[in-house]
């Protein structure tokens, strides 16, 4: 199982939100580059970065910080947030980003998604963020009438190989992932699933591993030290 330490960027800082609400932010580190280096030194093999400002604006607003992170670490970096054009994808890949996560664009611009998958194949990941089972977009501010299962099936049919699934109600809560929705999603599609939101303990990670979930994104639990990164990396290697 892949472990993805999370760095959420807002105004150039590393922050955490509570249930996706921008008004409920906590600054975890004023220096995201330093945080990325910390994660790498602890053994992280890949980083998950979200440009929160970009998710709202519809364009990458933290590109200089993302570029600095890519130059500062030797491990791969995947990035999401506000990526809604091929130019944006190409720009991120050109500064050293390994994989790009498309969210809003996956729902509203299928032709862009298809072209991105055609050009960049496994480098394109789709992020499905759900609230009460329905897909949320534009930085989680808008709720659609599309179910997360329906969108996942569409993505699979378009050649997407990996999905990041986030239950917004769990994000930043340390209340545990939504295992039920993840299990249903796993039954519905045959592509890689990365779980995000609510992971609070090594037991949560073990349960996801037992479900054969491909990867898990861990944010608040690492910053609040309810999960030790070195320990969880060791545990997942032994499983």
Curated annotation (Swiss-Prot):
One of its GO terms (biological process) is L-histidine biosynthetic process. It is an enzyme of class 5 (isomerase). Pathway: Amino-acid biosynthesis; L-histidine biosynthesis; L-histidine from 5-phospho-alpha-D-ribose 1-diphosphate: step 4/9. It comes from the Bacteria. The active site is at 8 (proton acceptor), 129 (proton donor). Pfam families: His_biosynth. Its EC number is 5.3.1.16. GO terms for cellular component: cytoplasm. SUPFAM superfamilies: Ribulose-phoshate binding barrel. It catalyses: 1-(5-phospho-beta-D-ribosyl)-5-[(5-phospho-beta-D-ribosylamino)methylideneamino]imidazole-4-carboxamide = 5-[(5-phospho-1-deoxy-D-ribulos-1-ylimino)methylamino]-1-(5-phospho-beta-D-ribosyl)imidazole-4-carboxamide. Its main location: cytoplasm. Belongs to the HisA/HisF family. This is 1-(5-phosphoribosyl)-5-[(5-phosphoribosylamino)methylideneamino] imidazole-4-carboxamide isomerase.
């Amino acid at each position: 199982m892949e472990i993805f330490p999370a760095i959420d960027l807002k105004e150039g800082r590393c922050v955490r939100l509570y249930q996706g609400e921008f008004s409920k932010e906590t600054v975890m580190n004023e220096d995201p580059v330093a945080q990325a280096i910390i994660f790498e030194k602890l053994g992280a093999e890949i980083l998950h970065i979200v440009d929160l400002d970009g998710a709202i604006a519809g364009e990458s607003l933290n590109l200089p910080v993302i570029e600095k992170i890519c130059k500062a670490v030797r491990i791969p970096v995947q990035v999401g947030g506000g990526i809604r054009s091929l130019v944006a994808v190409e720009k991120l890949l050109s500064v050293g980003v390994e994989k790009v996560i498309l969210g809003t664009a996956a729902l509203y611009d299928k032709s862009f998604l298809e072209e991105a998958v055609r050009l960049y194949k496994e480098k394109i990941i789709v992020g499905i963020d759900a609230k009460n089972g329905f897909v949320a977009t534009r930085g989680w501010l808008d709720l659609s009438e599309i179910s997360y299962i329906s969108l996942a099936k569409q993505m699979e049919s378009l050649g997407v190989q990996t999905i990041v699934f986030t239950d917004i109600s769990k994000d930043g809560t340390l209340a545990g992932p939504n295992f039920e929705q993840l299990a249903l999603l796993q039954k519905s599609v045959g592509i890689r699933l990365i779980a995000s939101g609510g992971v609070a303990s090594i037991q949560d990670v073990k349960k996801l591993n037992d479900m054969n979930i491909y990867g898990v994104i861990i944010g608040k639990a690492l910053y609040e030290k309810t999960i030790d990164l070195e320990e969880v990396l060791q545990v997942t290697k032994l499983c």
